[in-house]
């Protein structure tokens, strides 16, 4: 049975005005919990021949903050009041999965503790300076040699090839499919922007209004 998603938001804010409210500063920090998110259920085995139906299966927590500063004033231009405002703002937020039925924490599905936008990958410790250093490298990275166009034979490594880090210490570079057993992979980045910026200018004079806004991330 499907139900409505529930959103619970907690926040604390501060608004300050200076110079007869010509200069205004505001700040807001928040935590937003989304319960019973509607999304696809766990990935089904291929023999089912169909994708998992959408269900209320996940909870998500978003933490963030926003800040802005605004300057507004007016003066007389050609015997008419000229009003203007300049505003700049910045914000940041991150979201983590707090509930999802994925005890094995497979990377093909959401898992508890996952930050949205996570990018998993290998860690590289520079490159081999000499052929001798490459030949003497004790870690078998034949699995990832295709990424650097190296041969699997005798590790196929030469000076200038990338040196992958053996994170689990078993002398072999391996791929993971689960956050419970990371093998030689880890979170190396995020596809979502951290900081969002906005800027705006508005003005009106003699019945003429102008507005400019821009956003960036």
Q: Where in this protein do the model-derived segments appear?
A:
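Conserved small-residue
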Residues: 58, 65, 74-189
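Extended amphipathic secondary-structure runs
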Residues: 186-211
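Outer-membrane beta-barrel signature, preferentially recognizing the C-terminal barrel domain
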Residues: 1-24, 52-79, 115-130, 190-195
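Residue-level detector of the transmembrane beta-barrel scaffold of outer-membrane proteins
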Residues: 24-26, 66-68, 83-87, 200, ...
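Outer-membrane beta-barrel proteins
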Residues: 16-20, 33, 69-77, 84-86, ...
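Flexible, solvent-exposed coil segments and beta strand-coil junctions
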Residues: 41-52, 174-182
């Amino acid at each position: 049975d499907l139900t409505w998603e529930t959103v619970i938001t907690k926040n604390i804010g501060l608004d300050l005005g200076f110079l007869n409210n010509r200069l205004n500063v505001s700040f807001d920090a928040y935590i937003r919990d989304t319960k019973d998110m509607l999304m696809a259920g766990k990935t089904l085995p291929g023999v089912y021949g169909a994708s998992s139906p959408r269900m209320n299966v996940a909870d998500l927590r978003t933490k963030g903050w926003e800040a802005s500063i605004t300057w507004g004033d007016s003066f007389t231009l050609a015997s008419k009041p000229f009003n203007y405002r300049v505003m700049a703002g910045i914000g940041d937020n991150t979201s983590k999965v707090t509930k999802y039925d994925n005890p094995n924490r497979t990377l093909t599905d959401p898992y508890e503790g996952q930050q949205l936008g996570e990018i998993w990958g290998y860690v590289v410790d520079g490159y081999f300076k000499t052929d001798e250093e490459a030949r003497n490298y004790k870690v078998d990275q034949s699995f990832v040699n295709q990424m650097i166009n190296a041969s699997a034979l005798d590790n196929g490594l030469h000076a200038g090839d990338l040196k992958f880090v053996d994170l689990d210490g078993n002398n072999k570079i391996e791929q993971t499919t689960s956050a419970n057993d990371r093998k030689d992979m880890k979170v190396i980045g995020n596809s979502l922007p951290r900081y969002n910026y906005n800027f705006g200018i508005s003005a009106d004079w003699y019945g003429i209004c102008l507005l400019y806004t821009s956003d960036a991330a």
